[in-house]
Amino acid sequence: MSDEDADEYDDQSSISSVSDDDDFSGSESESYQDTTESTGPSEATTDEMLWGRRRAPVCGIAAQAVRRQILMNQQHEPNVLGNNKKVYQTFGSTPQLANERHKEMYSQIRRGDDSSFRSRDRFVPPRRPRMGYGSSDLSAIEEMSPIRSSTYSSSSEAHRLSSLRAQTEWKPQLTSTTTSFQPLSPMNHHDKENGPFKAPMSPVCSSTPRSQRMYRKNPKYRRQFGSSLQLSESRLEESTSQESERAVTPESWMEHNNENEHPDQMMFAKPKQGSFPRPEAFGLDNAYAKHKDIRGIIFLSMSLCGRRLTLNVQNAAYFCSAARPTSVCSYVSAVLCHRPSSQSSSSSRQYRQRPDECYRTRLVTNCNSPSFDESFYFTFSENCVRDLLIVTVYEMDSNNAEKKRILGCMTFPVSRILKKASQVVGDPFPHYRRQDPMEDVEINNEGFFLLNKDQGRKQNFPQRKVRRQTFYEDPAFTGVSSAGSSVISNNTGGQMTMASPRLSVPNELTMGDYYRSTGSSDMRGRSTNNLLDYTSASSSTNGSAGGPEKLKLHRATLPSITTTTSENNSDDAKSLSPEQSPTDHHFLCPDDNGGVYGAGPAHSAIKKSSVRRAASFTFSPKHSSSKTNLRQLNGREEDKEKKRFLGPISRTLSYLRSKMDLALSTSSLYPSRDDVRQWEISFESLLNNKFGCALFRQFLKKEFSDENMDFWLECEEFKKMKDGKKSTTQKAIEIYSEFVAEHSPKEVNLDSDTRAATKAAVEAGCKPDTFALAQSRVEQLMSKDSYRRFLRDRLFLDLLESYEITDKEDKPSSSKDKN
């Protein structure tokens, strides 16, 4: 057939094709094998109507079915289409190249007269835009949009080019708008030969510099497809030729949707390095934490409900540096250690045999900031005042569970927990009956630093105890004016103007809490500007330097306005400046030592050697002293003589004197020789003497049983109160709640009958003899147990030996006087 005839037939024919979605059955395929039996026009295409009934199908699944059927029938029936007509198959079973695969749109079947049909290069597949005339490679161009419907399935076509939409090399920087890729719907049908369909991996919101910088952060991340899309014909041909050689990542579409994540997060999902807790984050200085060996902090909360303590272990943070980035496997242990009282009784022996209550949390592995969030419950007994609650944090080796070490610990005395509960409630805790409902009382809810083993067994370090000192709280910075004016702190040879600020004097207005609490004598560089202006009626200091009048830095001491002036001493005139008139007080500045009175306790501690203190205005002759001074000197001599006789226990006596009533005279405070000897004989004489009670209480404090002496003294004071008053009833309730009630902060050792009788007496009505029975029981207990050990203690023996030494010294002196 000539070319002109081919063009003529091309213009007249109406070309149509088989749809990709058509489902060809086996009956339709058989109609193409033997076309002599088919009569309906629906069994053949338009080209078969034009060229004849023996024309093969054009393309699609029908063409594939015909080819397979021809190959199967070629062995048995080689002449299917007739005796004089032979079929020639030009295709083979070996795969063709990718650039030539698209050219074979249908099977090239020769006719009986050996004339071949025309080439169908311009035949366009269905559902694809017709590209017109031009290069044959342009027929493979598909839709350029990166979004593809989920209903489209690529399984309907065989050996076709994979779409450019399936390439993960597509980058959003080629578009002019911000792009967000979200899967429209999961694709359930995939072609296993071509690999699963994947959307391009890119951030949710991206732009050109952002995406380039993002992929450049991690050099280990390598994209599967390095070439980018270029809108040019040559680049398109190159990408289509290399499409079959690219590898597809075998990752399922239905897995975790990680297309909006950063490539570093998708491929290298490891814990972040460098985010380690530091002491500065919790207000603690790093140097101090290293010096005290503080390795972390743990957050605890405690609440008390009657006899039940709830300990909640919240979370912790372990301090470590970047040089040691290892994670910690840790757990927390809480132990309630029972410590019986020093009194040897049957109840204390039973309490000593009681086992400790121990709890521990779960093990948190490889974490420097673990979160435990576990609660433990402890029940306090009657003799729990001396018990200790110890919280310990252990670090365990991940490979060997037997290897562990203490990261830190802390100790909470039960007596202090009960004391805090009483402070929160307002009354001594617990002041409830067992049948009354009780609410939870919050004791602690804060962080506690992990101390080492030695310090943690004795105390705890809460986070609120850290003193955060800033630059404006430092005394070195408070002496400089914020307005930029200078403050004179040294006696230099310069001059100051009339309106210049003076040296500040510490008083109630200018002195803060820091200076009231300190007794330092050096106030230079610490004092703040005085709020009083001595040159005008206003109380503000003027920072402007103006005025021609000058005053030299000579300070004059003003006399006190509280003293009566009779006649001035000759020494007072020397304190004034010789260049100025003594009556010109307009430019005089008050001295630090005596100018302003009533400046607080720190005023008397200020001393300066450069300024002379003013003399007294009342004249008195030399070598004259008042009667008051004589009495003071005589009292001091008597005190020295008493201390010399007492010998090595003078410090103890001084301490006891400071604790006792200061109004007592010296003779009533220090015991005589007969009193000390009487203490050794009778326990009642020891209790009836105030010094003896103080000394005996000091001994009981060493044995942790001073609550017995405190209860005895409170009962003695209660006997002196009047009956029937409200204060008497309130005092009785306080004594019962503090000493007699069960689980009280200072519970004394009483039997159950005595405790019940005392409780009934308090409820019946407060009388002077309400605590008589309990007081007698405690007195008997002290006389049989503590008093005997007191007589053998070094505190009493030193006092007794001191009087014996003085007796030996007095005997030789008395014999000399007789001679």
From Swiss-Prot:
Location of region: Disordered: 1-51, 112-135, 149-259, 515-594, 617-640
GO molecular function, one term: GTPase activator activity
Skewed-composition ranges (Polar residues): 32-44, 173-185, 517-533, 559-568, 617-632
InterPro entries: C2_dom, C2_domain_sf, RGS, RGS_sf, RGS_subdomain_2
Keywords from the UniProt entry: Signal transduction inhibitor
Biological process according to GO: negative regulation of signal transduction
Described function: Inhibits signal transduction by increasing the GTPase activity of G protein alpha subunit egl-30 (G-alpha(q)), thereby driving it into its inactive GDP-bound form. May organize egl-30 into a stable multiprotein signaling complex, and thereby persistently inhibit egl-30 when triggered by calcium or phospholipids.
PANTHER family, sorted: REGULATOR OF G PROTEIN SIGNALING (PTHR10845), RGS DOMAIN-CONTAINING PROTEIN-RELATED (PTHR10845:SF259)
Domain statement: The C2 and the RGS domains are both required for its inhibitory effect on G-protein signaling.
Subunit structure: Interacts with egl-30.
Protein name according to UniProt: Regulator of G-protein signaling rgs-7
Higher taxonomy: Eukaryota, Metazoa, Ecdysozoa, Nematoda, Chromadorea
